[in-house]
């Protein structure tokens, strides 16, 4: 040991801000664990199942309110999360499927508003279109006629959100990518072909997407002091 450094205070492993963020994220991880441990069958719709499913996303609203000192970006993310929670609850009941699609479409529009159009990066848009067209072209053959219009509109909102998330980069980009993976897996499993462990893939990527997008608020200078 360097004798000249004896007695000097050690640099903390985590900053106070990181500990503050971690503290307010802990309810998200706890409620995610509850969801996966309970694993309530999705063929038995109930308000308990809906609540357990929504709690991780609602906990992220609390997280954003706790760590952000205010601003339009955080407010739009909170709005998107609340719309997502409504969508989560609706999708528990098959008869409310279109209501769930509408709620998630509203969430994507709020994410789009939050992400903005700068930098534009049209090349990324071209890549998203080239990836989306073959997938949706195949899925289209399996969709019930009465859902084609609604799911086409939803797919456009999702693809645009992916483009803007990737353009923003960082945790936002990863979150947008995982959100898209979650939704495309869900749609293929529901309408085209049953996939092994589809629900696990859908919910793991979905919760990961929401927390990654929420963490993008840490790039803002308006974080609340601890």
Swiss-Prot record:
It is a multi-pass membrane protein. It is an enzyme of class 3 (hydrolase). It is found in: Endoplasmic reticulum membrane; Cytoplasm. One of its GO terms (biological process) is ether lipid metabolic process. Competitively inhibited by lysophosphatidic acid. The chain crosses the membrane at residues 24-40, 47-64, 77-93, 100-117, 124-140, 147-163, 172-188, 200-217. Its EC number is 3.3.2.2. Residues 41-46, 94-99, 141-146, 189-199 are extracellular. Keywords: Cytoplasm, Endoplasmic reticulum, Hydrolase, Lipid metabolism, Membrane, Transmembrane, Transmembrane helix. It comes from the Eukaryota. Belongs to the TMEM86 family. Catalyzes the hydrolysis of the vinyl ether bond of choline or ethanolamine lysoplasmalogens, forming fatty aldehyde and glycerophosphocholine or glycerophosphoethanolamine, respectively and is specific for the sn-2-deacylated (lyso) form of plasmalogen. This is Lysoplasmalogenase TMEM86B. It comes from Sus scrofa (Pig). The lineage of its organism: Eukaryota, Metazoa, Chordata, Craniata, Vertebrata. The gene is TMEM86B.
């Amino acid at each position: 040991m360097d004798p000249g450094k004896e007695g000097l205070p050690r640099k903390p492993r985590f900053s106070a801000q990181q500990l503050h963020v971690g503290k307010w994220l802990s309810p998200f991880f706890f409620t995610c664990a509850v969801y996966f441990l309970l694993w309530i069958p999705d063929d038995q719709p109930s308000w308990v199942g809906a609540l357990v499913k929504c709690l991780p996303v609602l906990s992220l609203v609390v997280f954003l309110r706790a760590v952000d000192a205010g601003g339009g970006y955080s407010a739009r993310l909170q709005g998107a999360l609340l719309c997502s929670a409504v969508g989560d609850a609706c999708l528990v009941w098959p008869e409310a499927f279109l209501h769930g699609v509408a709620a998630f479409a509203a969430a994507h529009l709020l994410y789009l508003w939050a992400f903005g159009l700068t930098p534009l990066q049209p090349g990324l848009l071209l890549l998203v279109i080239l990836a989306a067209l073959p997938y949706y072209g195949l899925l289209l053959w399996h969709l019930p006629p009465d859902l084609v219009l609604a799911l086409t509109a939803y797919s456009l909102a999702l693809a645009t959100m992916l483009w803007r998330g990737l353009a923003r980069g960082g945790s936002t980009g990863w979150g947008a990518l995982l959100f898209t993976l979650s939704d495309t897996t869900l749609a293929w499993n529901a309408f085209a072909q049953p996939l092994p462990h589809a629900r696990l893939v859908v919910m793991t990527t979905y919760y990961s997407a929401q927390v990654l997008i929420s963490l993008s608020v840490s790039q803002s200078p308006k974080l609340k002091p601890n």
